[in-house]
């Protein structure tokens, strides 16, 4: 088994490492299933005390998330609830020592002041930056900023130039009065690969499932090693129970609809829209990338999926595809530990010496891999089969594309051109295996990669 991700978690003002771990609540418990979370304590002693006669000041101090007996520390000095940014260099040296002892770390989660110092830290460590006297550590693969902000003093501008290129997820509260959306927006503007999740709360780490899975999916969208040197556009293809966005139950599909299954097979097999066959190649084959549980759920007679290159994403280096010792390894079936590794494997196995030309690359599930692909910079398209019936499910697609500003629905002619086969338009009557009549609809969405879309989410109306 490969090692789990290691994540550096930086607390906010008047907190400590243990307090932040506790304040993360169910998020910490959930993420700990997938990663090692480490919680250092800042070196700045916070002596902030509220005037006992000032209720507003008491509420504001409580909102910062400290605990009476939990220790009160920070990463910057503060006066009258405003960051002076004193001791920032001491804090970086403290973090550096912790990283040398406990690291290296794959990524960072920072809350409030922890996000503020974390943004500086990530920028100093990103590729292409000159050596600095404060921190020595490999670049982070991802950063998550909750209630994050940019230091507003001009002497700190060098921490935001050039822009942070490390993939960043910004989680901000629409009711946050301590770090308003306008301040979070200033940080997003200095991040080149930014994603934004908004929650309706105040200055907190939101506990709802969508944010827990969002952080997890974002962390695992980062490549386990170097980003692929052989980029190809990725297309997610999924059938979804609407409106609950269910995609499975007990690791199997809760419906069996002939038209839906035929559409999936035809689209992922068709190479009509993959261009001309190159000289020296005998055929074009598409790639289907899936999670281990998704592959294991396929009927054995259908594994691997015929006439397609199958790649299973698993961190188990001993995964054997469910084969017995006597069974021969099928052709065009491989394992990789992440999407980027899968693309590198495709380039290695189907290069100039191969007679097979690679067509489209599809992400076919399950929910964990969909979540990772959602944040992957190479994901450009989503083929969304909407089943207009709500089935009981225990796994779900991570978002509704029709309600997302990051995705734009394409016209039906564009759908047909993209898949290369005729597709019926609108809501179609179909029958499930138990003769129950349902309606299905085939949709195509294109991803909007413009960072201004993320900034629009943080606009103040």
From Swiss-Prot:
Organism: Schizosaccharomyces pombe (strain 972 / ATCC 24843)
The protein's enzyme class: oxidoreductase
Gene: dfr1
A Gene Ontology biological process term: one-carbon metabolic process
Keyword Nucleotide-binding annotated: yes
Protein name listed in UniProt: Dihydrofolate reductase
InterPro entries to which the protein is assigned, alphabetical: AB_hydrolase_fold, DHFR, DHFR-like_dom_sf, DHFR_CS, DHFR_dom, FSH-like_dom
Biological pathway: Cofactor biosynthesis; tetrahydrofolate biosynthesis; 5,6,7,8-tetrahydrofolate from 7,8-dihydrofolate: step 1/1
Catalysed conversion reaction: (6S)-5,6,7,8-tetrahydrofolate + NADP(+) = 7,8-dihydrofolate + NADPH + H(+)
Disulfide bonds: none
GO MF annotations, alphabetized: ATP binding; dihydrofolate reductase activity; lysophospholipase activity; NADP binding
Listed EC numbers: 1.5.1.3
PROSITE patterns: DHFR_1, DHFR_2
Role this protein plays: Key enzyme in folate metabolism. Catalyzes an essential reaction for de novo glycine and purine synthesis, and for DNA precursor synthesis.
Record's keyword annotation contains Flavoprotein: no
Family listed: Belongs to the dihydrofolate reductase family.
A GO cellular component entry from the record: cytosol
Keywords from the UniProt entry: ATP-binding, NADP, Nucleotide-binding, One-carbon metabolism, Oxidoreductase
Pfam families per UniProt: DHFR_1, FSH1
Sites where the protein binds substrate: 260-265, 308
């Amino acid at each position: 088994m490969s090692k789990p991700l290691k994540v550096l978690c930086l607390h906010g003002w008047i907190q400590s490492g243990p307090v932040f771990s506790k304040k993360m609540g169910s998020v910490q418990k959930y993420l700990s299933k997938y990663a090692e979370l480490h919680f250092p304590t800042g070196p700045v002693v916070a002596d902030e005390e509220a005037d006992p006669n000032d209720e507003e000041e008491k509420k504001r101090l409580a909102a910062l998330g400290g605990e009476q007996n939990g220790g009160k520390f920070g990463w910057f000095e503060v006066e009258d609830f405003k960051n002076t940014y004193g001791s920032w260099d001491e804090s970086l040296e403290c973090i550096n020592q912790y990283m040398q002892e406990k690291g290296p770390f794959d990524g960072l989660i920072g809350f409030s002041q922890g996000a503020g110092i974390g943004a500086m830290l990530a920028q100093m460590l990103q590729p292409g930056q000159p050596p600095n006297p404060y921190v020595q550590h490999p670049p982070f693969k991802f950063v998550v900023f909750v209630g994050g902000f940019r230091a507003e003093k001009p002497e700190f501008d060098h921490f935001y130039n050039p822009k942070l290129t490390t993939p960043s997820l910004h989680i901000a509260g629409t009711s946050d009065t301590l770090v308003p959306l306008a301040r979070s927006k200033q940080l997003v503007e200095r991040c080149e690969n930014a994603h934004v999740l908004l929650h309706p709360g105040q200055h907190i780490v939101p506990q709802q499932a969508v944010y827990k899975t969002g952080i997890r999916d974002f962390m695992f969208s980062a490549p386990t090693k170097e980003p692929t040197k052989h980029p190809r556009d990725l297309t997610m293809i999924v059938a979804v129970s609407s409106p609950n966005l269910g995609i499975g139950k007990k690791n199997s599909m809760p419906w069996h609809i002939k038209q839906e299954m035929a559409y999936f097979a035809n689209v992922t097999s068709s190479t009509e829209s993959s261009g001309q066959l190159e000289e020296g190649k005998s055929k074009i084959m598409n790639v289907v990338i899936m999670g281990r549980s998704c592959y294991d759920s396929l009927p054995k007679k259908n594994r691997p999926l015929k006439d397609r290159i199958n790649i299973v994403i698993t961190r188990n280096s001993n995964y054997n595809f469910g084969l017995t010792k006597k069974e021969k390894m099928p052709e065009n079936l491989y394992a990789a530990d992440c999407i980027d590794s899968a693309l590198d494997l495709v380039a290695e196995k189907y290069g100039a010496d191969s007679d097979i030309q690679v067509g489209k690359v599809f992400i076919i599930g399950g929910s964990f891999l969909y979540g990772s692909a959602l944040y992957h910079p190479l994901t450009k398209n989503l083929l969304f089969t909407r089943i207009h019936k709500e089935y009981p499910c225990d796994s779900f697609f991570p978002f509704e594309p029709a309600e997302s500003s990051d995705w734009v629905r394409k016209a039906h002619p564009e759908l047909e051109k993209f898949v290369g086969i005729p597709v019926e338009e609108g809501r179609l009557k179909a029958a499930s295996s138990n003769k129950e009549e349902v309606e299905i609809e085939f949709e195509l969405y294109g991803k909007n990669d413009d960072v201004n879309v993320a900034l629009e989410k943080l606009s103040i109306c």
